[in-house]
Amino acid sequence: MKKKLTILLVLAIIVLVVAAAILLNRPYKPTSFVADGEIFSATVDNGNTLILDLDNDSKNREWSITQAPECFTSDFSTVTENCSEFHIIALNDGKGVMVFQCVLDDGTVEDYELTLSISRHQKTYLQIDSVSFEKTAA
């Protein structure tokens, strides 16, 4: 009886060790997703890169970044007829807010906040988990 119990206990330990090894050695798979709003479209590509398209259909808006956090940055922007595109990359994990300024043709200035939540996986990979883009209260 003791021999059977010992064998079952050893088998259970082996199964637990194998299951833990499989869970801990899973390869990192970045998540891509799209977040759309009334005047923006944000595409997270390969986990740590964000393409932010800001609407300019009426051609009366000029977008610029006025404040950037330490956990992400914009490395380039492109302005076309219908939108302004910002390429944003994650630099570190955490939550950060980037402030965009929109200047309308009539001189009116509106501020918008891009808020990102970034997590770290397997100590080296960054993943953008959530995106929000909202107009700030004046």
Language-model-derived ranges and their functions:
Residues 2-7, 19-138:
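Extracytoplasmic soluble-region selector
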Residues 11-19:
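Core hydrophobic alpha-helical transmembrane segments of single-pass membrane proteins
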